[in-house]
């Protein structure tokens, strides 16, 4: 063999060896890259307070607030406060739907009001939720707290009769009763021994522990798809004293309303501790039951507030629960890789004694007009705080308009994935804002009062298609420039008819398109109730 042939052979061997080494290296790198993302992805903890007003958080209301919230402010000092953040609705279930799906609730059957007692699920089984999205990408997902989005209760029409005509502070369709009949109790035992379908564990969550609604039956905890214990006594009306919007119904013997919030805190801390010990990132959705009625303040927190009001005590207890969650994250040594999001489902409820609070110098809506259920800002402008160490600058604020629907797109971008066209139709990622950009991310944000009055916000302009509070009335339209009039004191609809027409047409387009973000046109579940009418 000649020298040239030997050299050629030698070079061929070297090339073959190099190729083998490159293949081995590629396989190793590919395997490593595949293994790294699940570990590197941040944990996500979403804390949703219930009926906590914009002015109930001390960092949002330093001059007109009298309730200290040091633990919520602790999140703010380590992250970003959004000053123009909104829930999708002025009340409960609609906001929960929108937060979990990234889609406005008024695209569903819920054109007004909330999901009722024993009602079917509002989230369609095939609808992607933030939990389902996270689960697709290797997350363990848990929900601890108030669900209030409906279940597939296995209850026949005949059995439903045993659950009707009980009273309470909100009426409930009947007078207050002192006890249930023997026949009713037997039916209850049968109903609540069955599995309950259609809840959180069928909507993307691996586990669930909580109460469906703390002021409605059944008065028991639900774990995954079963009641914890069998509600077999009638909750006495005395337990609901001074707790508006609460109903009598089946309860566990010795059920204590003031034990609910501590139990949820215990379970949430346990979830964090357990999940932090695994190789999986986790998403914890913690919809608290407070400070919503029943104002069930634990004994240790009664009388703690300086203004001597049970609601103030309950807000302070709620704040302490937030502190327990933050402590659990730190004790589990995952704080540096955990996104904490804190917000509220709507504004403070006027019926908890707002006039007394304001007389004592505490204004639950701060500088805003209105309260829970309203289309006014006080109904849906809420605290919204995000902490993400090494990603979000501490102690910062953002003035851009955002909404609770934005969690879906935000989480998708954190995961590095693109949402399908039929998911998160109204959601826009907050990451640009969290990284310090200062620009509008929404063409418009839509609000709705609890009765069903729609309102649209674009830039500083807000158009309410009816009165700011109370029943739907198509004869009214109210236009405000919030940059000049945050308190919504001067209606500009007569002075700027062109802006009224512009925003009305924009609202129509958002309805017809089935989405408010770029993407393929989608269908609403029902015909959206929108009739601007002929305003006077």
What positions do the PLM features span?
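Bacterial N-terminal signal peptides
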Residues: 16-29
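Formylglycine-dependent sulfatase
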Residues: 11, 31-478, 482, 486-536
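N-terminal secretory signal peptides that target proteins for export/translocation
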Residues: 1-14
């Amino acid at each position: 063999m000649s020298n040239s042939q030997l050299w050629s052979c030698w070079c061929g061997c070297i090339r073959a060896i190099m190729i083998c080494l490159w293949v081995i290296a590629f396989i190793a790198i590919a395997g490593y890259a595949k293994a790294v993302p699940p570990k590197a992805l941040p944990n996500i903890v979403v804390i949703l307070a219930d009926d906590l007003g914009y002015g109930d958080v001390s960092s949002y209301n330093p001059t007109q607030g009298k309730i200290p919230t040091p633990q919520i402010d602790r999140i703010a000092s380590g992250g970003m406060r959004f000053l123009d953040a909104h829930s999708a609705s002025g009340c409960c279930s609609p906001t929960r739907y929108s937060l979990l799906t990234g889609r406005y609730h008024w695209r569903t059957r819920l054109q007004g009001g909330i999901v009722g007692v024993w009602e079917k699920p509002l989230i369609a089984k095939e609808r992607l939720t933030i939990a389902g999205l996270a689960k697709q990408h290797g997350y363990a997902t848990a929900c601890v707290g108030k669900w209030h989005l409906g279940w597939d209760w296995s209850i026949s029409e005949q059995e439903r009769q045993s659950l009707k005509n009980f009273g309470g502070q909100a009426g409930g369709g009947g007078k207050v009763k002192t006890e249930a009949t023997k026949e009713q109790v037997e039916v209850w035992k049968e109903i609540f021994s069955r599995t309950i379908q259609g809840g959180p564990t069928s909507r993307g969550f691996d586990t669930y522990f909580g109460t469906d609604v703390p002021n409605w039956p059944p008065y028991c905890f639900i774990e995954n798809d079963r009641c914890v214990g069998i509600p077999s006594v009638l909750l006495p009306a005395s337990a609901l004293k001074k707790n508006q919007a609460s109903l009598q119904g089946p309860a566990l013997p010795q059920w204590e309303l003031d034990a609910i919030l501590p139990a949820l805190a215990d379970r949430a801390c346990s979830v964090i501790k357990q999940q932090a010990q695994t190789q999986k990132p986790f998403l914890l959705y913690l919809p608290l039951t407070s400070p919503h009625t029943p104002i069930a303040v634990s004994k240790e927190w009664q009388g703690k507030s300086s203004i001597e009001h049970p609601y103030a005590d309950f807000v302070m207890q709620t704040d302490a629960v937030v502190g327990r969650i933050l402590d659990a994250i730190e004790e589990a040594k995952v704080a540096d890789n955990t996104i904490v999001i804190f917000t509220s489902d709507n504004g403070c409820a006027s019926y908890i004694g707002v006039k007394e609070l304001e007389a004592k110098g505490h204004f639950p809506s701060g500088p805003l007009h209105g309260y829970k259920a309203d289309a006014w800002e006080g109904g849906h402008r809420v605290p919204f705080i995000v902490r993400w160490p090494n990603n979000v600058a501490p102690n910062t604020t953002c003035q851009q308009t955002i909404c609770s629907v934005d969690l879906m797109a935000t989480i998708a971008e954190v995961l590095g994935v693109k949402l399908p066209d039929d998911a998160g139709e109204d959601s826009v990622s907050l990451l640009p804002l969290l990284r310090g950009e200062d620009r509008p991310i929404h063409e418009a944000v839509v609000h709705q009062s609890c009765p069903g009055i729609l309102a649209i916000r674009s830039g500083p302009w807000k158009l309410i298609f009816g009165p700011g509070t109370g029943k739907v009335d198509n004869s009214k339209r109210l236009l405000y420039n919030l940059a000049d009039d945050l308190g919504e004191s001067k209606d500009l609809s007569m002075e700027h008819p062109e802006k009224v027409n512009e925003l009305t047409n924009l609202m129509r387009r958002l309805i017809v398109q089935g989405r408010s973000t770029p993407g393929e046109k989608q269908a609403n579940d029902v015909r959206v109730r929108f009739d601007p009418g002929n305003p006077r």
